[in-house]
């Protein structure tokens, strides 16, 4: 027992000595302008160190141990660089408040869509909004300057992420500048005089249908048909004039299209909510913004994601959300999206972003809000 304690104490002493060397390495790299992370050099070191072991178990253990030591050493060097004033500016213009005067806002869907409700909640009832057919159209409109802001659903508390909009954040150089959470209460609506027993087909957005699966389990004779928007389903029921059709949308849609609510709040989760993001083509943020969204690609190897997330852990940063999406041109490889608390001026955030930027294949700042 004593021998083990003695060895552990010696390991701690040597580890402290190893970290002291990191300071000198950082000073050298600051002077020469070299990057902290040199993958080729580290791989060579790991191969040389593992060759000192005489069995595979020890080889793996040595690689794991020294990967961690090197990772911690890099984090120390990132911190020292920040302390020396070497900071990567993110080039977001800070403002006291976003400029909504004469702003044109675009949302996907038709009159009565939840996106329209989110828009009016965030920008005000009398905001200058208009609709397009698809989320991609909305992103295109702010890219070309036709609109100043777009309102896009990004995540539902029951059905999960809106994957297409995560992909659009990567495809376009547009930025998240705000968010709005809207309570989602789905109503089943049909033509005036219709009853649930008349209904044979229900239309709605795929996520809305998913969120109301319990209702369909109780009405197995009803066919589900996906359409591009919840409010569009209400418009379709009105336009088709077929008493056997119903739509799932907000009660506001029923009022707009003159439909009758057959049953209210049919979603599985009575606390159902959707988070919408406000997107702009400008790299702008409110001065009090305290949430940052990023995405990054990692090397396709064991432990790569852990090493990226370790930058948040070591710097005491609270992650709020993490999602993954497949990379379209790389089979079985993924891009990761992370929301976390903090500001670009925070030392901890600067350290974490420096580490991820150096060690990831790619990093994109999606916005701060």
Q: Which positions does each model-derived feature cover?
A:
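Domain-level signature for soluble enzymes in the chorismate/prephenate branch of the shikimate pathway
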Residues: 3-369
